[in-house]
Amino acid sequence: MSTHRKARGMRTQLLVAQYLAANGWPHAESTGSGRSGVDVLGTPGLAFEVKARTDLNPLAWVKQAEQNAGLPVAVFRPNGMGEHPETFIAFLRLGDLTALLRAAGYGTEPEEQG
């Protein structure tokens, strides 16, 4: 990996951690490079995997996040996105998304299958 790509990845991880810290997870912090596990610490119940790449492989990223405890979320910063983490793209499984949306008051409880 080139020095520029590695620096962009670390910068993206830091931006995501700072965004989370300012938006409800005050203890969020970037793990730094070379550490195994989640990319952002201080987000109990969540497992963030942060990617700043040109290739697109969300299934692998979500599976990587699933290796850690918590709700797996892969955050992707495509090229040309700038340094605005609120515009980055987040991937999570549809079942997890619908559960979160229902908990937030959207939709209705699923019908029981008999």
Predicted feature locations:
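Catalytic phosphate/metal-binding cores of nucleic-acid and nucleotide-processing enzymes, i.e., regions
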Residues: 1-114
